[in-house]
């Protein structure tokens, strides 16, 4: 896939970025609650990813903002104005869907120009704007091609150009990469992010892919059962998750039994300080990430090497403690030869674990 060039001369960028606010937003479908009092603010010009498992409410929130779905209560504001009574076609938002949703009987150029045609723009203006946008997404040579003559990645870039044609102040992306193969998905991920930064357009990006959210977004909002668990930068979300759900949904975690001490917890006979709160009761576990676990060969060590998964520069080892707890550790691949399956190791944890949580029921 060709990487899109910088904006062509004359391409009009977004006419000012918008602030988007969800206030106490609720939506139910029968007995199922999709959104349970969502409060979230999207800053002007940022790309915010809505991340969470299926059914968490992320697409419902996007569709309510777009005007394709009604809400039960709460408000959706753009620059302080409640837009929930405004028809979808007047909301100044462009949307890109997972399924591309291109018109099969229209060429790439006519697909991009369709919204302009509906707005009453003249033929010359439509063609000029559509060609500028095709240049922007790197597909001017596909102007007269039809959707069936293009790859999935090319079709999605046409859909993106179409969404930008009316110069919306908010861009909505509903899992736009999930139908693409891995290589094209990675390329288009980088391209969307670059275009978003160049255009300065406020963007909401729905995804269930943690890597996609962390690599593209300025901030990530993690939803669970219609509620906001945490909204933070990717580094903060990964390194300082607010809840055990966030910690385990974003990246890999191991849970290791621990006991409470006066100033922290004790794990495998060693004391550790804890930054966050420690639950007052129940069986406790520390949560640690594989890259923060160290293993060294030790004939009588507490960890039995069970398996290894090659990941390139690192290899992920799974070790089992005497109580049956399994812990994952990422080691440089060249160091793994000293720790074959069946060998024992000494296990060292970070001075401060990511989180302390009650043992799940």
Where are these regions (language model features)?
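Non-catalytic connector elements of ABC transporters
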Residues: 2-4, 253, 263-361
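Conserved catalytic Walker-motif region of ABC-type ATPase nucleotide-binding domains
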Residues: 15, 22
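ABC ATPase nucleotide-binding domains
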Residues: 47, 86-245
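The feature captures the beta-strand-to-loop junction immediately N-terminal to the Walker
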Residues: 51-53
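Helix-to-loop junction immediately C-terminal to a conserved catalytic motif
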Residues: 66
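Conserved ABC transporter NBD signature motif
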Residues: 74-82
């Amino acid at each position: 896939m060709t990487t899109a060039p910088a904006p062509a001369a004359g391409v009009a960028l977004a006419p000012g970025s918008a602030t988007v606010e969800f206030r106490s937003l609720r939506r139910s479908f029968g007995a199922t609650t999709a959104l349970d009092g969502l409060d979230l603010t999207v800053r002007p010009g940022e790309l915010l990813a809505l991340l969470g498992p299926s059914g968490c409410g992320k697409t419902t929130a996007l569709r309510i903002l777009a005007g394709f779905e009604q809400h039960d209560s709460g408000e959706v504001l753009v620059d302080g104005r409640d837009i929930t009574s405004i028809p979808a076609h007047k909301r100044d938002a462009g949307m890109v869907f997972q399924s591309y949703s291109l018109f099969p009987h229209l060429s790439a150029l006519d697909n991009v120009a369709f919204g302009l045609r509906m707005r009453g723009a003249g033929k010359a203006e439509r063609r000029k704007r559509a060609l500028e946008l095709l240049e922007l997404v790197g597909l001017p040579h596909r102007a007269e091609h039809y959707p069936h003559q293009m790859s999935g990645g090319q079709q999605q870039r046409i859909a993106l150009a179409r969404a930008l044609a009316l110069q919306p102040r908010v861009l909505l992306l509903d899992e736009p990469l999930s139908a693409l193969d891995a290589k094209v998905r990675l390329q288009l991920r980088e391209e969307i992010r670059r275009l978003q930064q160049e255009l300065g357009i406020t963007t909401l990006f729905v995804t269930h892919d943690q890597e996609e959210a962390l690599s593209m977004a300025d901030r990530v909002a993690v939803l669970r059962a219609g509620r906001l668990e945490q909204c933070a930068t990717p580094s903060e979300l990964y390194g300082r998750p607010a809840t055990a759900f966030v910690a385990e949904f974003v990246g890999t975690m191991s849970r290791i039994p621990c006991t409470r001490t006066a100033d922290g917890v004790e794990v495998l006979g060693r004391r550790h300080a804890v930054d966050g709160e420690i639950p007052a009761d129940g069986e406790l576990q520390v949560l640690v990430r594989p890259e923060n676990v160290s293993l060294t060969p030790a004939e009588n060590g507490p960890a039995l090497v069970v398996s290894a998964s090659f990941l390139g520069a690192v290899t992920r080892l799974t070790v089992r403690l005497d109580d049956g707890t399994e812990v994952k550790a990422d080691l440089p691949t060249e160091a793994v030869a000293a720790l074959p399956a069946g060998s024992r190791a000494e296990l060292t944890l970070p001075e401060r674990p990511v989180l302390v949580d009650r043992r799940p029921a």
